[in-house]
Structures are given as structure tokens and as C-alpha cells.
Amino acid sequence: MTVGRPEGAPGGAEGSRQIFPPESFADTEAGEELSGDGLVLPRASKLDEFLSPEEEIDSTSDSTGSIYQNLQELKQKGRWCLLESLFQSDPESDENLSEDEEDLESFFQDKDRGMVQVQCPQALRCGSTRRCSSLNNLPSNIPRPQTQPPSGSRPPSQHRSVSSWASSITVPRPFRMTLREARKKAEWLGSPASFEQERQRAQRQGEEEAECHRQFRAQPVPAHVYLPLYQEIMERSEARRQAGIQKRKELLLSSLKPFSFLEKEEQLKEAARQRDLAATAEAKISKQKATRRIPKSILEPALGDKLQEAELFRKIRIQMRALDMLQMASSPIASSSNRANPQPRTATRTQQEKLGFLHTNFRFQPRVNPVVPDYEGLYKAFQRRAAKRRETQEATRNKPFLLRTANLRHPQRPCDAATTGRRQDSPQPPATPLPRSRSLSGLASLSANTLPVHITDATRKRESAVRSALEKKNKADESIQWLEIHKKKSQAMSKSVTLRAKAMDPHKSLEEVFKAKLKENRNNDRKRAKEYKKELEEMKQRIQTRPYLFEQVAKDLAKKEAEQWYLDTLKQAGLEEDFVRNKGQGTRAVQEKETKIKDFPRFQETTKLSIRDPEQGLEGSLEQPASPRKVLEELSHQSPENLVSLA
């Protein structure tokens, strides 16, 4: 951190001093602000924040005496902090203390330091204050009283309290890097190496300009470009061959002499062909069907928006109807405002128009019996009534006869005698009597004159098989009849369902919308292709009209040279660019006022024309203001004598 002086003051570089800059933050926190008189106002560093008091110092109101007094107090505080933090327990503290005291005394008692020239910046003149926490704005040539050295003895309790925070303090050290950077900058500006670099840069720029001004000429077109390609040669040879074939064919046909009946047959064939063509044309004309035109609502591009709008209206109507229903349900007495609209809804009217052929009021009204019948009792009663009504067929009565075979005596066999003897000897219980056959019991009940009837098992099985076959056949017939009835009912139901669905469904089939959508997609593809071609043509036109790169470079260089010549002319005349610009604007304003005064009678006519043709008036208003570049070019063409006269 340095305190700058004016350039003309003697010893300006030597009189500057550094005030405790940190060692590690020399390069990063060296930002300085230069005022108009050469005063350097450094930024506040960590040491300044540590040493500065907790009050704002106003540079316009504080006097030099109060500043020096504050400096002495800060010096005393810094000494105490350094002594307490560094040398409270070190045996070599006496030597370090003496060295630090010498450095501080040499800094604060330096007689060669000049007075700091502090001037109020423009910001302070306007009423704004600036906080300054650095030490380089303080005067150093004011006589300072001799300070009393601090006493070396302190109570042990104070040493212990200080040692708790003294280890975390960073001790700053002075440095002279800012002076070194300023000296290096001055040496670099005045060194011959910089002049050599400038000379090389100017030489390189001249070579580039000469290279840009060089003229180019196109080389002649090579001879092989005009020679035909192999493909073109082959195409020409093929065309010559076909021409020769056609010519020879025509020659042969011209030499041929046809008979008279061949010409007659060809004429007949041609007449028949013409008749067929006329007949087919008439058939095509008669067979043309009257095609239905596509409605405009489908071809309209805003169909989707209309559908969305209709859906939104439908939702609003539903919400309003729900609110009306809620009010009608909540109020016990229906008022006149809550009565239903006598005019039916659109959906109801559409349903009545489409489904008017269906019967809604049927004459047959079935009665519902709430009592569940006793099906088992009813079935038994039905069985009894059926048994009574059944017709009984009288059985065939045979005349009774008596067979005498039972009275015959059979001779006993020896095996039968043995078995009977064993049965008598064995003490077994008497065997159970065998059941008598039905035929025998029937015969016993009959009289002696009746003939017994015997039904065999085969007859019984045959009857049961016939009965089961008849039952199966009846069941099959019933199932077939039920299927036919069910099929008819389902067909009728499906027809009614499809009719109702078509009447209630607002969407159209794919066949109706397919052609319109196909046409719309084709139109969109055609439109995109046209836009793409138009963009390509615009790109080609921009590329063709754009100047070459060397032309752009030459134009920019010429513009820079004109601007530089204009600035040099102003410097030679002793004028500034801002002054000339202000003068030019002032003269132009005067000229505009004069032209307005002259053209005032024509104002009404111009306003009428602008109202009639607003586009032309807009174009004229856009063309009137001149660009600043044109103004600069006009001023650059003026001579230096005119510029001097303006001054």
C-alpha cells in the first residue's frame, strides 16, 4: 500500500512508504483506486481492520492533530498486543523486543516522509462520505511527542487472560512490492524492446495490408472440361443407331404395296374400334354415381378447436344443471325460477328424432306376485291330476286253462335222494324260503280257467330303451327350438343396440373421415415442401449476395483508416471528438427547426396522405433519421479549416 504524489513533485517515488502490508496477501489484495490528483486510496486489509477503531473517519472534517493522536493510540495498542502475544514466555524476548521497537521507531520517526496531499473526490463534494481504514492517508511530518516505554511487569492473571487469544493473531510485516511493480512498469515502458515490438507490429500490419490489396486472377479453364464424357458419347451413338433403324423401317414400309382387301379390313377394324370406344364412353357416363360431397365442417381446419369448444360448453351445461338439481332438491317448495325448462335439451331432441320408431309405451303391463309359490306341492297336485286324467287301456283277457303236467309224478333221481338225505342229517337251520316268481303269484291269483301272462326281461329292457330314446329326442328338439328362439332374440337385440349406439355416438366412422384426413395430410406435406424450397432459395440468395472475405477485410480496414484519419485531423486542429459531435448536433437541430418552419403549411397535406396510406408514411418515417455512422462519415469529409472555424 502506497501514498502517491504528483508527477512533478521531487522525490515522489522515494517519499512513498509502505505501512504494514500482509506478507501472504501482497499480490491478491493490492487493488488500488487512483483519484484525479494522483492520490492512491488502498483497500482495507486485515491489519487495518484489526488496528482501526470502531468509528467512521470523515476525511473532510478531521484535522491533522486528531489523526496523529489516533495514530499514537493505535501504535500503543499494537505494541502492547505484540509484547503480550510473542514475548510473554520466551527467554529471547528481550532481543526480539528491541528489534521490533527499533523498527517501529524508525517507521514512526522518519523525518523524510512528506505530507499526504489529501483532496476530496467528486463523490465527497456531492455529499457522500467515504470510510477510510488505511494508515497511508495520515500526515507523517508533524512533530510527535516522546512516548513512554511500556512497563515490563504485568500481573500474572492478565498474562494468562492474554495468552488465551494471543496465539490466533497474525503479525503483519512491511513490504515494498508496489514500488517495485511501479518501477518495473516505468522501465518496461521506456525500454528499447518495447519500441522494437511496436516497429515489428507496424511492419507486420503493413505486410498484411499489402497482401490484402493484392489482385487475384482466375486461371483458364482446362481443355478436358470441354470434351464429352463416355456416357454422353454412348447416348449419342445409341440415338444415331435408333435413327438409322427407324429410317430403314420407314423405307421398307414405303416400298411395300398392300392389297386392296387389307386396307378394307383395317378400315372396318378402325370403325369397330371407334364404336366400342363411343359405347364404353356412354356406359361410363351413365354409370357415374352421384357422390356425396364431404361436408365443410370436416374440411375446416379449425374442427378440433370447435370440438374442444363444444366439449367445454357441454361441461358448463352439466355443471349448471347439477347446481339447478341441487337447488331443487334442497328446497321443499319448487319456485318459479327452479322449474324445469319446458324446452327439451338438444340430446333429448336428437334421441327422440333418431329413436322415434321404437315403442316406449307398451299395452302389456305384467303383474308381479309378491308371494313365492310352493313348487313341490304344486308339482304333486299336478301329478295326481295327470294320473286321474290318464286313459287306462284294458288288458287282453285270455281264457283260463289248466295244464296237467303238475299232476304228473316225476321219478326220483339218485343224486336228488342223496342230497335230501344229507339235508335231513345235517343240523342246519331251515333255509329261507325262495321268493316266488311274479308269474307264479299271478297265476295263483287267477282262477283255474285263466291263462297266465309272463313279461320277460328283454321286453322290459326294450320298452325302457324305447322310452329313453323318445325322451332324448324330445330334449334335443326342445334344445333346438330354444336355440332358434334365443338366436332370433339376440339378433333383434343387437340390431336395436346398434341403432341406439349410432344415434347416440357423435363420432364418425373411419371411412367417412379417411379421405378428408388424407387430403389434409397431403396438403400439409405439399406446404412443408414449398416452405423448405423457399428457405433453400433464400439461403442460396444470401450466399450469392454476400461479399467475399477479402472484400469484407478490405472494407473494414478502409473504415478504420478513415476513422483514424478523422481523429488525427481533429488532433492537429486542436479539437476533441465530443466537442465536434455536440456542435454537429446543435447545427443539425437548428437546420431541422428551420425546415419545420418552412414546411409547416404542408403539414396538413402530409398528415392526410399518411392517414390514407399508413404504410408509406411508416416507411418515410423510418427512412428519415440518419444513422450515427453516416454522420461520422459526413464529418470526416469536412476539411480541418471548417473544423477550426466551428471551434
UniProtKB/Swiss-Prot annotation:
Coiled-coil stretches noted in the UniProt entry, renumbered to this chain: 262-292, 510-546
InterPro entries reported in the protein's UniProt record: FAM161 (IPR051655), FAM161A/B (IPR019579)
Q: Where is this chain compositionally biased, Polar residues type? A: 332-350, 637-647
Family assignment? Belongs to the FAM161 family.
Name of the molecule in the record:
Protein FAM161B
Please give the residue ranges the record annotates as the region Disordered. 1-39, 89-110, 135-167, 332-352, 388-439, 583-647
Give me any GO biological process, just one. cilium organization
Organ and tissue specificity? Ubiquitously expressed.
Kindly state which keywords UniProt assigns to this record, in alphabetical order.
Coiled coil
